[in-house]
Swiss-Prot record:
Name of the protein: GRB10-interacting GYF protein 1
GO biological process, one term: insulin-like growth factor receptor signaling pathway
Acidic residues composition-biased segments: 333-350
SUPFAM superfamilies referenced in this protein's UniProt entry, alphabetically: GYF domain
A GO-annotated cellular component: protein-containing complex
Role this protein plays: May act cooperatively with GRB10 to regulate tyrosine kinase receptor signaling. May increase IGF1 receptor phosphorylation under IGF1 stimulation as well as phosphorylation of IRS1 and SHC1.
Region (Disordered) location: 104-290, 306-424, 692-721, 820-842, 855-883, 966-987, 1000-1019, 1024-1044
Subunit structure comment from the entry: Interacts with GRB10. This transient binding is increased under IGF1 stimulation and leads to recruitment of GIGYF1/GRB10 complex to IGF1 receptor. Interacts with DDX6.
Biased composition (Basic and acidic residues): 148-179, 186-203, 237-265, 316-332, 389-403, 692-706
Modified residues (Phosphoserine): S24, S28, S137, S157, S228, S343, S408, S540, S634, S863
Annotated source species: Mus musculus (Mouse)
Bias-annotated ranges (Low complexity): 366-379, 855-877, 970-984
UniProt-listed InterPro entries: GRB10-interact_GYF (IPR051640), GYF (IPR003169), GYF-like_dom_sf (IPR035445)
Family: Belongs to the GIGYF family.
Amino acid sequence: MAAETLNFGPEWLRALSSGGSVASPPPSPAMPKYKLADYRYGREEMLALYVKENKVPEELQDKEFAAVLQEEPLQPLALEPLTEEEQRNFSLSVNSVAVLRLMGKGAGPPLPATSRGRGSTRSRGRGRGDSCFYQRSIEEGDGAFGRNPREIQRSQSWDDRGERRFEKPARRDGVRSGFEEGGAGPRKEHARSDSENWRSLREEQEDDGSWRLGAGPRRDGDRWRSTSPDGGPRSAGWREHGERRRKFDFDLRGERGGCGEEDGRVGGGNSHLRRCRGLDGFEDDKDGLPEWCLEDEDEEMGTFDASGAFLPLKKGPKEAIPEEQELDFRGLEEEEEEEEEPSEGVDEERPEAGGKEATPLPPPENSSSPSSLPALGPLWTTNEEGGEAVEKELPPAEGDELRGLSLSPRISSPPGPPGDLEDEEGLKHLQQEAEKLVASLQDSSLEEEQFTAAMQTQGLRHSTAATALPLSHGAARKWFYKDPQGEIQGPFTTQEMAEWFQAGYFSMSLLVKRGCDEGFQPLGEVIKMWGRVPFAPGPSPPPLLGNMDQERLKKQQELAAAALYQQLQHQHFLQLVGSRQLPQCTTLREKAAMGDLTPPQQQQLTTFLQQLQALKTPRGGDQNLLPTMSRSLSVPDSGPLWDLHTSASSQSGGEASLWDIPINSSTQGPILEQLQLQHKFQERREVELRAKREEEERKRREEKRRQQQQQQEEQKRRQEEEELFRRKQVRQQELLLKLLQQQQATNVPVPPAPSSPPPLWAGLAKQGLSMKTLLELQMESERQLHKQAAPREPLRAQAPNHRVQLGGLGSAPLNQWVSEAGPLWGGPDKSGGSSGGNLGLWEDTLKSGGSLARSLGLKSSRSSPSLSDSYSHLSGRPVRKKTEEEEKLLKLLQGIPRPQDGFTQWCEQMLHTLSTAGSLDVPMAVAILKEVESPYDVHDYIRSCLGDTLEAKEFAKQFLERRAKQKASQQRQQQQQQQQQQQQEAWLSSTSLQTAFQANHSTKLGPGEGSKAKRRALMLHSDPSILGYSLHGPSGEIESVDDY
């Protein structure tokens, strides 16, 4: 019988086989599923015959075909990439696929991850293995027809015509057997159509023996169930189930070409089939099996993404799982039909079969009861526990019976394609087999025992999922969900859940939880609680413990709000630190933290800070948030306040956390809104405070600048007054010196005019009075002076000085020149014409110095008042005649206090040029600039006068450079002047003694000789910078010089 089952397909197709031995590796296990008509060619055959370079036949190049002829032939759809719309259709949800199946539209969209007729390494059908489409010859026929689901979807017309040859591979798509009852029919139909071809051939050739009977010995011996592909004992893992189903699948297909097709075609007899199905040990078959049957059990454990693509956890390629999906699809059906044989691991493996397929479509919300079974297999594929985890969610044995019982209607639900007798015969045969399976299910006590044992082994895992897993557990951070049947599915990684969520598989009412959470919660509530999609990347809150009373829930919500509020405060604190407003920051933060909160909220905030201290080592994703906030809020590391743990932090044995309780969305919303309003209000108040501070700061700066300017002006004025006072003193000393010299030059007494009475002490001069009598006379003349002018203190301070100085020169000469100088000390000018020579000198000197002191109005100086009055008495009418010249000189001196140098002229010129408004007081600005010491103040003053322009900045820079040079030169000149002044003082003291001595003996000389001597004495070396002018000749001409 085995040999007969290898003879399949039409004779002409088998005749195409080129021979060859079984030892040569088959290009790919073939799987013919139909007896081909004479002119029906398989898809792969046509692809193999397709040559891209072929030109259009000449027969078609006629004009009558020109309207419909296209020069460039279109490539086969199998060679075309999928469009975006097709990709989108392939990622439809399970509901859409189920509807398509119910409508007879086929298996629905396949998985994008599978190859589309390109013969990838893991592709299904006859082409599995390492071969690809175009490595095989025509002899393979249509064997790989149903291998690639995407090829199917390229042309639905085949499916519409009822040719289900393409639909078996569609099991690779996201549709899982457990997710639809209606879809189970087409699924069964796939298996039926897959097997109808060889069955009809075999029935035609000899007896009606069932292909199921071929597998009978294998089932009786349970050989393939008890051993793994590598001969070792099996574990209860889903891979074991997959291997078992795979072998069964393979054997079924072996009859159709899985391993026997080559033998059938090349005439190799039944030796290969014997290897595949014989009773002599499964290990002997390994060399004849495809590589997908020989892999390690845990090689391809993994998960599926939203599109159904397999994400291996270890080293399996992505195509491996679509292959598994197809195998699992078949294996599940055939296993259901085969459950009359109670065996180990059947129940353990069955749910995994569907579960593996169910993974990409997690929430089967409209699926039938069996859907919950397969849905949980992959739950544990990510862990090494493998098999034990699978049975955790197995339904009771009644579920198995129900599923088995439902086989019969599912088998018969889709009618076979009309007109296909082989399909009809296959349907009848499968119905008979299903009835046998149903009968066997009713007395499968061994399976019930195995199921009970499996449930016991998974009891711990089940309880762990129901309660919170410790954080150290591998699945603590993975996700579980409850399907509509109440079964728990999982664990799934966050990435998987995110992909399924994006694909639209999850409704907001889906109950989800993490391994570390205690209870399930609707997905919508979790999103509200987390403030984001929980499957999106980001820090995850600590475990949510569900057995908390309402009081603690409320308190935890308040703490969460306080934490959020403190986070906002921390952000403001950092902003204020960045803006260097630390002094105001502390007060502001305290106000914001306490002033805006009600007393209960303040208490909650204090409680939260205590929790921060208690939770120095938070769990999970909070390891960064709370310590950072604790540091930012200056929470002390120790202290009596922080050593108090609240009940909320101690209830869970030190593991309490801010997130230990789910925050109710109804209370979260108002709290968040209130916090947002407070945040906005605080920002607005902060802006106002900042503006107010800036305004105050600006006012303070302006006031400081104004005060500084006033101080500078006051200092400038004082310096100018001091300078004028100093100059006045120097000029007065110089005038006294001149007067002394003049008296000495005219030491010959001139007889007074008869009409002019002599001075008070004129008669006493010749008698050689003592100094005491002289002083008394001088004091008497001073009393007369007080009668003529207002009494002034400086007169009594300085007049004795001059008298002491002059008195030290000797009594005789003093009597002589003091008698002539009476009017200087306030005596009445009664000398008339006899003093005309004196008047001529005063007229010259008053032009330069004497009248200046009076006109400048230095009333506060110590010596200027009496001297100016003396000058007016000495000069008399000639001085009044010079008033116009004095006024001109006064204006000049008032405008320019000191003679201008080159630096001052340059400053004024530049300021006139740069001053656009014309209202700038240039001399005053120059004077202020010259007195300002700080470069910053110079820049500030120039900016206030001229504006913040490049020209003003350049002027300030040049001004500072020139002023520095000028000051350096001034220092050098001052040093020279000090040296010269010292020399002059020494020389002047000696010269005064000499002149006094010469005056004392001048009576021995003639008038001409005496005048010559005095004229020589007039050649004094005076410092021009002190005097303001220099004397170069005996006539006493005045020449102005610069001060600098």
